[in-house]
Amino acid sequence: MLRRSKLCYNMLMVKPPVDEVQLIEYHATSIRRQIIQMLALAGSGHPASSLGLVEVLACLYFNVLRYNPADPNDDQRDLLVMSNGHACPALYATLAEAGLIDPLELRHLRQYGSRLQGHPERTRLPWLETTSGPLGEGLSQAAGMAYSLRHLDSPNDRRVYCIVSDGELDEGNIWEAVMFAGKYRLANLVAIVDCNDIQLSGRVDQIMPLGDLAQRWRAAGWRVSQIADGNDATELLTALGNAQGSRRVSKPLALLTHTCPGKGVSFMEYDYHWHGRPLNEAEAGRALAELGVR
């Protein structure tokens, strides 16, 4: 049975809040703690983007996505493609928080034989829709899925969500997918663009300026909505809720989501050096203390 999960509490035996926004914030804190712990244990990974995307993923899995907890391949589920696969620690921790994988499995991030690799691999983990790797591929995959779903024999209202980083907008493949989706008016496609303005070696606007992103997407036939604070659950839930009705407009939707890389850890926030640098034991301890772990 499909559901939008709002009642999964498998990390801390604490009575959950009732308010919808508080619920997302509750899960977000737990997810961040797991990200810090798993990256410190692995000794490698991408903390900044992972921490910045937590609220986006929490809103999707605890409010928006339709999925069947008993069947990851349910043919009525919504689809999520994570094009910026290096941020997968956030996805893995969210899957654990939602009760879809065992939280103990998070300890094995990037280990030989683990299902939780440095980029999501669908052949290992059934809750994934695609395998990621080179940046720029995910939106093309998502657009193909959305196009296929629209042409199924039976009527359906399934949606495809694709998380894309602003850094990978350097890739030409992204813009081919943007034009394709606009041409075919794929109203069942939502692109969530993680605008955190960092890449491995610096700021996005210094490495490859992207210009007026909203205008570029609109010019290709997309609806565009700006999310000024992509770590604010209220703003995210409002934007994602509005996306539910966007199919009446017959255009794909781009949510330009301005997140804080390293969110929740003061010494990591907005610092591009943490794009691909893991935390050592002392740094992890400081980060966890800021997240309320004593």
Predicted stretch roles:
Residues L12-I31:
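N-terminal hydrophobic or amphipathic helices/low-complexity stretches enriched
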Residues A28-S44, D194-N196:
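N-terminal capping segment at the start of a domain
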